[in-house]
């Protein structure tokens, strides 16, 4: 059954995608994108426990958006942390000083508007230059690499591609207690899904 107002929402989200991409292509690379200290500060700021509320919108479909809540914990990992060594090996990098820092993220998610089994998981990632190395992707257990940039001290953008799909993500802090996230999933140049998150620090 169609969700009231869904088509209007999809149109608005598509416009926001176009505006975001236009702004990104027309503006010069922000100097923050090459600053290791700024990247480390962003990861340190992310550390802690978060309550996440999110929606998944399937584009070009009358399907109602999926809704979920998650309990998330982010642990900051300094460069010498032992958790980063297996990640370096998985990506065929030298384990010694492979990353400037990283993080371990654990989560437990529950869908609120459909009957599905709760999901639990964890992932480890590290950053080096303008690349983010992860032990798994959004929809794969294989190690993946994302490109990232900081367009402001509180805003990070990432691009990831694997298995014929691409993922554009933006993470933005709103003050000290909240952050927003948006992920756009595309295949063959066609946007398929938008995931939007509001996360509150506990």
From Swiss-Prot:
CDD domains: lipocalin_CpcS-CpeS. Coiled coil: none annotated. The keyword Flavoprotein does not apply. Keywords: Lyase. It comes from the Bacteria. The keyword Disulfide bond does not apply. Disulfide bonds: none annotated. Signal peptide: none annotated. Disruption phenotype: No visible phenotype; a triple cpcS/cpcU/cpcV deletion mutant has decreased amounts of allophycocyanin beta subunit (ApcB) compared to a double cpcS/cpcU deletion mutant. The lyase activity is therefore unsure. GO terms for molecular function: lyase activity. Belongs to the CpcS/CpeS biliprotein lyase family. Covalently attaches a chromophore to Cys residue(s) of phycobiliproteins. This is Putative chromophore lyase CpcV. It comes from Picosynechococcus sp. (strain ATCC 27264 / PCC 7002 / PR-6) (Agmenellum quadruplicatum). The gene is cpcV.
